[in-house]
Amino acid sequence: MDAAAIISLLNSTSDRVDQFHVEVYRLSLYGAGIRGMEEETSLFNLFNSLNTSTGDLQLSVSFTVHVLKKFGFTGLAELTRYASPDFNMASSYPKADLLLTVTSFLYDLHPVRERSNALTFISSVYLNGYNYRSVTMPQFVKVMFDKGVIMIGDVSALDSLIKQYRPSFFNEYMERSKLTNTNSTFVSDDATQDNTAPAPTIPDDRATGTVAAEKGQPSAQVNQPPTTGGGNCTVSGSTQTSTNSFNSTNTVTAAGKEEKVSDDVTKGIKFLLMTATDPELKGVLERLKPLDGRDEVIEQFKNGVDLYIGKYGKHPVVVGQSAHTKGQQGSLPAEKVTNKIMEIFKPKYIIAIGVCFGMDGKEVNLGDVIVSDRIADLYNIRVEPGCIKARITDADKAGDTLVSLFRNPRNDIVSVIGKSRRFNMVKPSFDKENAKEVKVHCGPMVSTPALVDDAEFKEKLSKARPDALAGEMEGAGIFLAAKDHKVEAIVIKAVGDLADGKKIEYKDWKPFACQAAAEYVLHHLDDDRTIHM
């Protein structure tokens, strides 16, 4: 095993992981018999504890990949190469499999009302009215196990919920739980460190080893987005935070080797869907279906990039991601990754999907979808007293075919986005910034190297491009790659903030915006009229 490479990959993964996945991973370690990790918030340190307990680096990697993928964490293809293709959580760690399975079942309930009803039922019937809102979902599942509500091979207490929401869940789990523990690597609750030769501790040479949730709650002045059903919901106190996740059980990963995709599949792909951040990728992957004749979406690591191949609406597509970390956001990484994917596939169209910031809060509202007919490159600028000027004055035009397809939304498209089960509205009142329907605008976007969260700087951008509706970071690079390969490109992103110094207060709008942009593109690509593009 290449320990140095694994350390590097785990460092990168730990930097990207959110609090929800840390909570789930900590729960899985509890199921593996590892104690005393309640306060640990670093995935890297948690992995270190697992590796010390097992004494087997490959097993620890296999365990980690299984947990993260089960709950939609993406960008793991390279780390998966070091995992064992034969790893089986049910036989190796049956308690962890139970805890993860029940957590997944409860998280998959949507809309939020159904999930809340299920938790209320469990709490009132089995836990004497335990306040499930006082803990996170993984912590609640741990309470269920500790109180004997669920046991290895026995989730009959949830039978009525299973029959109502997911009939196949019980049978699937029971089949797995029949596996014997022969040759199992299960660490029992009573096991001590003396019984297992400890693995060498992987040094954590990063500046910090903790990953915590963003601090600060949205202020009363910032309206909150409609809750997106179908995602995961971490319940803490009276606050519900939506975190949408891709169900990776529909994905096949080429572990340790690259799966050969037939030339027919490669030639049939006309669309490249480009994302930058993890939330943007999740919004797309949640809607990606297996290709015709396949049971699973294909996940590959080729040419140094993670690829996802499946069907988006009526079309086979390849999905790419340019920013696994914050430091990879921007035009240059986006151009580099897009070019690498274009070397493998020969799509006719590139669609960048994700989140942007609104330039004019009076015209463009939080959650609105922006279809770019042009991208103004503000990477090359001249800074003058009190203003900035674009040195490239001509904005790049989006592809004519793509603009024609996406620029004039039919009324039912807006309604579909607003009323889809993925955008189930739970708030009783709505205003201009928290509307029941998502509005769609078509116009120029600026592409800038800066993550803008300053009203004065945004004003300078607005003076440089007064016609711009929104701004983002990757479009200029994607347009350059499209120009190099002589294909059409367009940027379709939804407004996640207003770049006015309140980014933390707007943070709940980001996952909603990811979903809105992904859903808008899906609705068009699912139209029969696009089949012959």
Swiss-Prot record:
One of its GO terms (biological process) is L-methionine salvage from S-adenosylmethionine. Residues 218-227 have a biased composition (Polar residues). Pfam families: PNP_UDP_1. Residues 1-262 are annotated as: Death domain. Gene3D superfamilies: Nucleoside phosphorylase domain. One of its GO terms (molecular function) is adenosylhomocysteine nucleosidase activity. Has 2 domains, an N-terminal death domain and a C-terminal purine nucleoside phosphorylase (PNP) domain; the PNP domain has ATP nucleosidase activity. Expression of the C-terminal domain alone leads to cell death in E.coli. Keywords: Hydrolase. Residues 184-248 are annotated as: Disordered. The C-terminal purine nucleoside phosphorylase (PNP) domain cleaves the N-glycosidic bond of ATP, and to a lesser extent dATP, to release adenine and a sugar triphosphate; has weak activity on ADP and AMP and no activity on dADP, dAMP, adenosine, deoxyadenosine or other (d)NTPs. It is an enzyme of class 3 (hydrolase). It catalyses: ATP + H2O = D-ribose 5-triphosphate + adenine; dATP + H2O = 2-deoxyribose 5-triphosphate + adenine. This is Death domain-containing ATP nucleosidase. One of its GO terms (cellular component) is cytosol. InterPro entries: Nucleoside_phosphorylase_d, Nucleoside_phosphorylase_sf. Residues 263-533 are annotated as: Purine nucleoside phosphorylase domain.
